[in-house]
Amino acid sequence: MKAFSPVRSVRKSSLTEHSLGIARSKTPVDDPMSLLYNMNDCYSKLKELVPSIPQNKKVSKMEILQHVIDYILDLQLALDSHPSIVSLHHARVGGSTSRTPLTALNTDISILSLQAAELSAEFTDESKSLCP
């Protein structure tokens, strides 16, 4: 009787893993370093675009995000207080709005979902009575 070992050959498994690694192309999800470099590029771009971030000083990612949030809030305030936007908003409130509020759309979708569930239950009950 011949004895055998339950352990696989190291050479065989490493060769298989190596050949699979070559055949498969790496995506950003597969390569964490690629994802990290991509995120760092995004932070660099944000640092360039936001005027309140000092360009010649090293800032943390958290500081960059805080500057971005502050900048967006400042832009929103400037937009809300701009005279032409304020007059446009008052004209729209007085007249009819051209778009449906999202709450009304969500309510309609909920009603349709309930109706579809009821119809599905009715069809299931009918098919059970037709097929003994």
Curated annotation (Swiss-Prot):
Record's subcellular location: Cytoplasm; Nucleus
UniProt keyword Iron, yes or no: no
Domain bHLH stretches: 23-75
Signal sequence, renumbered to the chain: none
Location (main, coarse): cytoplasm
Annotated function: Transcriptional regulator (lacking a basic DNA binding domain) which negatively regulates the basic helix-loop-helix (bHLH) transcription factors by forming heterodimers and inhibiting their DNA binding and transcriptional activity. Inhibits the activity of both neurogenic (neurod1/neuroD) and myogenic (myod1/myoD) bHLH factors. May play a role in the regulation of the circadian clock.
Self-association and partners: Heterodimer with other HLH proteins.
Name listed for the protein in its UniProt record: DNA-binding protein inhibitor ID-2
Source organism of the structure: Xenopus tropicalis
Biological classification of the source: Eukaryota, Metazoa, Chordata, Craniata, Vertebrata
